[in-house]
Amino acid sequence: MRLQLERIDIKAFCAGSPTRVSDHVLYADFSELERVILKDDRIRTVRLTIASPGERIRIVNVVDVIQPRCKVGPEGWDFPGWLGKLRIAGDGRTRSLEGVSVVLSNRYSKRSYSALIDMFGTGAEMSRYGATTHLSIDPVPANGVGEREFERAVKLAGLKAAVYLARAAGQHPVDRTEVYELNLAERSGDSPSRLPRVAYYYQLYTPQHDYQGIPDPILYGSEVKGLLPTLVHPNEILDGAVTSGHTIRELDTYTIQNHPLVRELYRRHRKDLIFAGVVIGVASLEPVQRERMAMMAASLVSNALAADGVVLTKTHGGMPHVDLALVAEACEHAGRRPYSSSWFME
């Protein structure tokens, strides 16, 4: 599978018609974008605001941050399962706007978790997003729309806006292109023998924080509560197959789109290791299911990917520690070394 990520640097963002990118400046026709968002009858009105670094602005009730991206080619391939047709993500060309993001706010959420982004002062200096220009989207639900339905509408509004902005750069020169290509059928005999094969175990969900007992959709627009350990191509993660849930408690979508561990394993591929592939898994509340998950994850790492070692990450704290430790232990019993654990916290 081969993914070509075409990055375009955005130096300024302002309202203007038509929506376009000219000389690294992004112009957005807010009236047109509002019409795109309000096609969803679950949203009554929406407020769009540009927040630039240094402005005395604090964005509150933040539930996700999304990088503007779109597939280059036929429309309908973006964020499959959410916007696009259900297909495997991770191949072809994807356009990406750098230095700008879509920020989703949901002031109507009754959940305990949301975030804020400061555009000035100490908060901006400490934030990953203090130096990024943002399009803040603040929707209002239509009468009679339930809380969970509105959450899905908010997510869709953000994804639509991300694609809308990225498509505006269709005629703009690309600043740099990154190619992510990995043949998962390659085995040790096909690669330099001196290099260890390293897999990645990505725990992407835990049920302990399910709101109202209902899991959020995060994989191809679907929830993963009962998901058994599954092989995915790392390009799927980078290309919109995985999104954040309906709060910022998980990794935000922007971070997943630029997953630092996946990109680092790619960077080191065929230099000091062979990137063997990715196994995704979930945490469980049931002890027997935990053992089952760990056993199956270790089998995929060992037998399907023929990995010599595995890097593991978890989601949230508390219970997921146990699940991750069991996966690491099962990998060790299979003769595969858990190289490290990286804790991606909210």
Language model features with spans:
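Long, compositionally biased, glycine/small-hydrophobic-enriched stretches that function as flexible linkers
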Residues: M1-V224
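Structural motif
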Residues: D308-G309
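A short helix->loop->beta-strand "cap" motif at the edges of active sites that frequently abuts
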Residues: H333-P338
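Gly/Ser/Thr-rich loops at beta-strand to alpha-helix junctions
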Residues: L204-T206, T313-V322, F344-E346
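Short Gly/Thr/Asp-enriched flexible loops that form oxyanion-binding sites at enzyme active sites
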Residues: M319-C331
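A general structural motif
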Residues: S284-L300
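Small-residue-enriched flexible segments
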Residues: A185-E186, S191-S284
